[in-house]
């Protein structure tokens, strides 16, 4: 994936978080984002954005970053 693809993924996950944010707790929004990403994103998309969150993550909103960091953990559960 190119940097443009990563930027698109960051934008998408932030939009998903914004759509789920109804004033609830950050971890609740992150759980909904995680569920959406696990259901609808290809493994390569999840891998790319998860590696970004681990290495930097500064362009991710707080609930997006939390959700993305939980991707690997949710597979083990």
Where is each model-derived feature located?
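A domain-level signal for the structural core that forms small-molecule/cofactor-binding pockets
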Residues: 1-77
């Amino acid at each position: 994936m190119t940097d443009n693809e990563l930027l698109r993924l960051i934008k998408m996950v932030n939009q998903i978080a914004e759509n789920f944010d109804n004033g609830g707790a950050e971890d609740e929004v992150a759980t909904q984002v995680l569920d959406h990403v696990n259901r609808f994103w290809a493994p390569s998309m999840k891998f790319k954005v998860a590696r970004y969150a681990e290495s930097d993550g500064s362009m991710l909103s707080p609930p997006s970053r939390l959700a993305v960091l939980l991707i690997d953990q949710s597979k083990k559960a």
